[in-house]
């Protein structure tokens, strides 16, 4: 878990302000100066935003396109965990019944799925979902997603318990408890909305959670289990109260929130909170709820988030500054901030019709690197010690050799036309002519969407076209400059994310 309270008064004040919606109404300025003291104290800055990613459902991980995207993203991030739905979907074949109605288990595809992840250096967040039809109380309780997962409770809780025990025991037998104990087992997905058909919804989910957690822990107490994996930061106090009062095991809290969710739904307020602040405000709310509970030690896994989906923003350079905002404001709040998703190998609405449809991933259909792919690559270079700064559009970090890695960005005000702005870094504590290097993603740099449009926006790009787009948009070599009397002047284009290295 994060040592949450060790962070600076500045950061705690920021978190509190976000939780109450106080940080609103900021406007980008045409000119901005950022004061940096390289000798200032630092605080740990774990890379919580790039260590866990979501993806399309379990069976898709057997596709080579999925694995290609996983390997590509892992090359430019600290990708450690992947979370997907539907490991118990009938297409995975885990649960069946013989002619006498007796349970029959089959873990063949489960093994292929998890073997493939581990072979590529990524571990699973085992989201335990959805209900096998032959175990379902209502076999016809199908979700409208394209793959029609069953959202019913089990017809027999005893059979569910047995399935959970067999599932966990198989994983321990195959991979060893030392490995499985590093995984996270998350019970269901967003049970507060239409992914769960139990009645009453909350109480029936809590019962499912209790049975699942006890069954998993019955196989080995080192297995880590948590929830409630709710949409819109819901149910957390009730979940923690239930688990504490009923002595139900829980090793972590998980929930979801997206930047474009309604403020009332996400935060329970009518405050005017800009989209880019909403996810971390919700996470801060949940963190405070955990701290106020009987289980304040629990880590928080934010297992789904993304930038707004309107206007196909997820395919554009906008993701960079929005991502950087989330990294800055969620620092110290969540143990993981899991971007949904790393790949557009994703079929909730059916197979993709063409690349760049505004899907969630960092790579478009066919293995095309989106601008967001390069945004994550830039932020990966940040150090693991952070220097506090008073502006909202910069992150200052320090490396072991004393050099600085600084991210600055130009996030447009909501509803306003994005414009370029001038930024001056005034840096103390380094030689006044120190060498710097600069890389960026913006409308003109590493913008694969524009490269795709230059090719005529083909619905089915040929492999050579994909290779061409990725080659043309790869991060450019750093621009080398020097400080001028301790200062560096930059012009940030609209939707720019810029990484500056100061020092060796």
Where are these regions (language model features)?
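Short acidic/His/Gly/Ser-rich catalytic and metal-binding motifs that mark active-site loops
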Residues: 90-94, 133-143, 193-196, 260-266, ...
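Short, conserved phosphate-binding/catalytic loop or strand-edge motifs used
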Residues: 183-190, 303
